[in-house]
């Protein structure tokens, strides 16, 4: 998953990512709402069932980011393929291709849980005018996207 922020100036900046192989979704004792600890044990691996929604909790790695008034938050769910400049993953071969659906309705809800810190001061009141001013935080034009069901 990739978390990005839509800025008030119409740009979108990368915030942070999280990775989970869905077959390794079993969480261990000691997990919390903000920190799902996965067992990653071979005996706990379980393929995704066909035509059924299951919970897969993905940790978004620690970060600090100021969300200013007028900003948006976007969570993109994707397979870990060649969408990273420096990191790639060896994906299991899927002879018939692979698709996944993310529930986003009352009967199959999804949620994004983020920690919040109040009372922090000292950060600029506006975003940097140079979209790529923050190191390792690429930025681009924000493109509106609407979730649609797979056909």
How would you describe each model-predicted region?
Residues 1-151:
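Glycine/threonine-rich phosphate-binding loop and adjacent beta-strand/alpha-helix elements that clamp
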